[in-house]
């Protein structure tokens, strides 16, 4: 572990965080009375959206544009990349599902805030072409998520089938700022409904339907198809189902 990371952690006890499915490792720790997170990624992911240093750069660029974690320290060695961030306030939106809080409204507000980030000077490209290059690299390195399920998509039976299908069905993109993984575990809500966003490694310019697709899937799988449809019906634009499906398929191996 690099000296700068060791010095900041000092004698704090690292607690593993098991939430999430990425190849990154996350630990929380207390320093004084404040909560921090140490996130690391293997060096082989340095050129991908799993890169911790990429995420740190996204967070630093977003500071003042969106409520995101403060980056405290970054470092790297031959094996891993490292980032320490300060914890954001609030609780995950996932904890509010099933309560009396306005979950759909909070999802819509989260989407509005993210897509309102100006992209004219955004240096991060997360468009479909970039993500497909990333998927091809991960597939070639044997780094894809092996727990995939193609049952919903007839004619696709292997990861190679899916990659070919994705290349053949790239949608026309309406580029906005995208979180890249906008689900209920990555949106934090305070008592007065102030929103904070975490896990922005995939952040950057991308099609507006990417984040919509993730929210729709989140609601469909965790609540009901009806509630997911209600979310779509309240959008200010007509649904583009083909775009949503493309981004769900793109995420299946990641």
Predicted regions and their residues:
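ATP-binding glycine-rich phosphate-binding loop
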Residues: 8-31
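Charged phosphate-binding loop/patch that engages nucleotide di/tri-phosphates or the phosphate backbone
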Residues: 17-18, 237-254
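Active-site acidic catalytic loop and adjacent metal/ATP-binding pocket
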Residues: 23-31, 37-38, 161-210
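An alpha-helical support segment within catalytic cores of ATP-dependent transferases
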Residues: 2-7, 113-179
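Conserved Hanks-type protein kinase catalytic core
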Residues: 86
């Amino acid at each position: 572990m690099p000296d700068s990371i060791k010095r900041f952690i000092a004698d704090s006890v690292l607690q593993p965080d098991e939430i999430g499915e990425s190849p990154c490792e996350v630990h929380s720790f207390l320093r004084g009375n404040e909560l921090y997170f140490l996130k690391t990624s293997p060096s082989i992911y340095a050129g991908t959206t799993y890169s911790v240093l990429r995420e740190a750069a996204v967070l630093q660029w977003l500071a003042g544009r969106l409520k995101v974690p403060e980056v405290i320290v970054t470092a790297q060695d031959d094996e891993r990349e490292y980032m320490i961030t300060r914890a954001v306030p609030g609780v995950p939106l996932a904890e509010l599902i099933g309560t009396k809080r306005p979950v759909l409204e909070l999802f819509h507000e989260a989407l509005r805030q993210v897509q309102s980030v100006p992209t004219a000077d955004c240096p991060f490209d997360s468009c479909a072409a970039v993500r497909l290059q990333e998927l091809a690299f991960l597939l070639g390195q044997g780094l894809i998520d092996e727990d995939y399920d193609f049952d919903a998509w007839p004619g696709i039976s292997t990861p190679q089938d899916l990659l070919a299908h994705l290349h053949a069905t790239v949608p026309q993109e309406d580029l906005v700022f995208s979180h890249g993984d906008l689900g209920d575990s990555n949106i934090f809500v305070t008592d007065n409904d102030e929103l904070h966003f975490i896990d922005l490694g995939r952040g950057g310019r991308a099609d507006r339907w990417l984040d919509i697709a993730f929210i729709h899937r989140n609601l469909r799988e965790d609540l009901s198809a009806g509630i997911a449809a209600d979310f779509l019906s309240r959008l200010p634009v007509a649904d583009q189902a083909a775009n949503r499906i493309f981004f769900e398929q793109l995420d299946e191996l990641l």
